[in-house]
Amino acid sequence: MKEYTVVVTGATRGIGGAVARTFAAEGAHVVCCGRDADALAELATDLDGLEGDVTTHRADVRDEFDVEFLMETAARITGDIDLVVANAGVYHGDPGHTPLAEESYAAFDDHLRTNARGVFTTVVEALPYLAPEARILVPSGSVAREFKPGYGTYAISKSTAEALVHGFAAELDHPIGIVDPGVVETDLTGTGRDPADVAPMFRWVALECPPEDLNGQVVDLTVWKQATR
């Protein structure tokens, strides 16, 4: 995978960090994006010594100019981008205990700016630099499709992100899809599967999933397990 370039937003922890490690371990050049410079430095140290090259880049997906420079940097290093994982996300509140009517306007705005507009910005700014066979993956969860009490505007923002994937799938030549790994233990959830256990799922979707099955659809754990059993 020496000639394979991956851009992961929200790469400093959780799913993003595990996905970055998986691809770097196989020799890909992984460009890791995050807002926290200290966390990026820790990530670089953690991934140092793996087979692939790792580049860390501070960027905020809420800022299209940051993301534009991120994609320019990734492409300048290796020529083009083979995989984009639009993983950056936030949750303001306690999962399962965030009623819509009790959320602040600030939380509403930031959920949408980060979790939905951030996906839009990441895809749009990556397009000029994508390799012909490049893929775009957007992590999500069932809360985006099966609204449950207590997930507030976070659920709304993830539903919006999935709608964006459907829209892009209708217009782009590149395979783009939603990856739903189930409940994963992250800073957002605090409980669930180890991110390292689901990172191979992202690798499979990126490299082995038939492109016709990555046309705006949701690829969940069941699909992955059936395909790899």
What are these regions, as identified by a protein language model?
Residues 135-160, 165-170:
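Catalytic loop of short-chain dehydrogenase/reductase
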Residues 26-42:
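Conserved glycine-rich Rossmann-like NAD(P)H-binding loop of the short-chain dehydrogenase/reductase
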Residues 38, 57-72:
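The beta1-alpha1 cofactor-binding region of Rossmann-like NAD(H)/NADP(H)-dependent oxidoreductases
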Residues 174-181, 190-229:
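C-terminal helical subdomain
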Residues 12-13:
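Conserved glycine-rich cofactor-binding loop
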Residues 101-120, 161:
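Catalytic Tyr-X3-Lys loop
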